[in-house]
Design a protein with these regions (language model features):
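Aromatic "clamp/platform" in nucleotide-sugar-dependent glycosyltransferases that forms part
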Residues: 269, 288
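Short hydrophobic beta-strand element within catalytic cores of glycosyltransferases
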Residues: 305-308, 318
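A short, well-ordered alpha-helix in the C-terminal region of glycosyltransferases
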Residues: 341, 348-362, 374
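A conserved mid-protein helix/loop that constitutes part of the nucleotide-sugar donor-binding site
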Residues: 26-37, 204, 213-228, 333
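Conserved acidic donor-binding segment of nucleotide-sugar-dependent glycosyltransferases
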Residues: 320-321, 325-332, 341-346
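A short, histidine- and acid-enriched strand-loop-helix "catalytic/donor-clamping" loop
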Residues: 76-79, 111, 125-142, 157
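A short, active-site helix/loop in glycosyltransferases that binds the activated sugar's phosphate group
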Residues: 154-179, 187-189
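Nucleotide-activated donor-binding/catalytic signature segment of Leloir-type glycosyltransferases, i.e.
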Residues: 251-268
Length: 382
C-alpha cells in the first residue's frame, strides 16, 4: 500500500509538446529533451508530441528507446484505403490517450501558436510554457491578442531564458505576466573548461559561432564592418563556425565581392567547443535576436570574452568593457563601435577572459537540466 501511494504521489507522467516545425531538430529542443531523459532516469514516465519528419532526430529516438511514448503529429496522409479502414491514433487527442499529469510546451520562437494549451486547460492538466527566443521582428496580430493572452495567463509557469525575452513577449501581448521564471539552457562544455590561450604574435583571431543565417545571427553586418579601410589594415581575422541555414552562399560571395578573403574565413561546423577556443581569442556575435545564446555562455566558460549585441541574456551575463563588449544595437555603426573598443583593449583580452569565466560561473547555473527538472515537478504539485 505504501509503495502504491509513493508511485501515485511521486512518480509523474510528464508530457512534452514541441512547437518545432521548421527543421527536424534545433537548439531550442535541447533543454526539454535532456530534462525528459533525466526525469526518465528518476522513474517518471515521459510522453512526447513532436512534428513528423522523414528523418527522426537521434535525440528523440534515444528517449523512445528508453520508454518514452512518442507521437509524431501531422504525418503525410496514408493511401485512400488505409484512411478508410485504419484507426489512426493521430485522430485521437494525444492528451486523452497519454493522460499526462503535467505538460511542458516549448516554443522555439514567440509567435508560435499553442492551441494545445487550451486542450490542457479544458482537461485540468497543469502546463508550463518555455519560450526559447523572442524578438521585435514579428508582432502578434491584434485579432489574436486575446487567444495568446489566454494561453499564457492560464499556464502554471511561463519560462524564459532571459529577462529581455520576457519583456518582448509581454510587449507583444500587452500583458504583464505574474507567473514567470527565468531559466538556463544546458551548455556543451565542461563547467571547469580552461583551454590554452592561443599565441597572438602574428595577430588576433576571433570566432563568430552560429548557424549561417543572416536574419538571426547577423554575419552580413560583420562583412560591412570589416570592409572598412581601418579593419583591412589591422591584424585581425574573423573565422565563421556553423552549419549553413540558408546564407552560406551569400556570405562567401560577399567575402569575395569585397576582397576580404584574408580577414574573413569560413570554417564550417565544429562540435568541439574547447578546440574552437584553443584557436581563437574572443567571440564575436552580432545577433539581431537571441534567447540566451549558448555560444556566449560556452565562450565565457572557456575564459574568452564576447563582443556581442545587447540581445537576449548577453548584458545579464557580462559587464561591458570589463568581461566583454556590448554593442547597443545591430547597426554597422554600433557593432563597429563595440569592436573598436575591444580592439583598443586587445592586449587585455586574456585577463578580461578570466574575469568573464568568473562572472559566468557566478551568474549562470552549473546544472540547468537538474534545475529545470525540479521546476517542472512544481507544476504538478502547484
Amino acid at each position: 500500500m505504501a509503495v502504491r501511494r509513493f508511485l501515485l504521489e511521486y512518480l509523474v507522467k510528464f508530457g512534452f509538446y514541441s512547437c518545432m516545425s521548421g527543421m527536424p531538430w534545433g537548439g531550442s529542443e535541447v533543454l526539454w529533451q535532456r530534462t525528459a531523459r533525466l526525469l526518465q532516469l528518476s522513474g517518471h514516465e515521459v510522453a512526447v508530441n513532436f512534428k513528423w519528419w522523414p528523418y527522426k532526430a537521434p535525440t528523440l529516438q534515444h528517449l523512445e528507446d528508453h520508454g518514452a511514448s512518442l507521437w509524431l503529429r501531422d504525418p503525410p496522409p496514408p493511401p485512400l484505403l488505409k484512411r478508410v479502414f485504419s484507426s489512426d491514433p493521430q485522430k485521437k487527442c494525444w492528451l486523452d490517450v497519454e493522460k499526462p499529469d503535467a505538460v511542458l510546451i516549448t516554443l522555439g520562437y514567440h509567435p508560435d501558436a499553442i492551441p494545445i494549451a487550451d486542450e490542457c486547460y479544458r482537461r485540468g492538466i497543469p502546463y508550463g510554457i518555455n519560450i526559447q527566443c523572442a524578438s521585435n521582428s514579428f508582432f502578434i496580430h491584434g485579432d489574436r491578442l486575446e487567444e495568446y493572452r489566454r494561453w499564457y495567463r492560464n499556464a502554471k509557469k511561463v519560462y524564459f531564458v532571459s529577462e529581455e525575452n520576457q519583456l518582448k513577449l509581454e510587449n507583444n501581448i500587452a500583458l504583464k505576466l505574474a507567473n514567470t521564471e527565468i531559466i538556463a539552457n544546458p551548455f556543451n562544455v565542461s563547467h571547469q573548461a580552461n583551454p590554452s590561450w592561443p599565441e597572438s604574435d602574428s595577430g588576433f583571431q576571433i570566432a563568430l559561432v552560429g548557424r549561417i543565417h543572416f536574419q538571426s545571427k547577423g554575419q552580413d553586418i560583420i562583412v560591412d564592418v570589416m570592409r572598412q579601410p581601418k579593419w583591412r589594415k589591422r591584424a585581425l581575422k574573423v573565422v565563421f563556425y556553423g552549419h549553413d541555414q540558408g546564407n552560406k552562399a551569400q556570405l562567401l560571395e560577399l567575402i569575395k565581392l569585397h576582397g576580404l578573403e584574408e580577414q574573413l574565413v569560413f570554417h564550417g561546423f565544429s562540435d568541439s567547443v574547447e578546440e574552437i577556443w584553443e584557436n581563437n581569442h574572443a567571440l564575436l556575435l552580432p545577433s539581431r535576436y537571441e534567447g540566451a545564446p549558448l555560444v556566449v555562455i560556452e565562450a565565457m566558460l572557456c575564459n574568452r570574452i564576447a563582443i556581442t549585441t545587447d540581445i537576449g541574456r548577453n548584458r545579464e551575463l557580462m559587464d561591458d568593457n570589463e568581461s566583454g563588449f556590448v554593442a547597443m544595437g545591430t547597426s554597422v555603426e554600433l557593432l563597429d563601435e563595440a569592436l573598436e573598443r575591444a580592439w583598443q583593449k586587445r592586449h587585455q583580452w586574456q585577463e578580461m577572459g578570466v574575469l568573464a569565466g568568473k562572472h559566468i560561473r557566478e551568474r549562470y547555473s552549473d546544472d540547468p537540466v537538474r534545475d529545470f527538472a525540479e521546476a517542472l515537478k512544481l507544476i504538478r504539485s502547484s
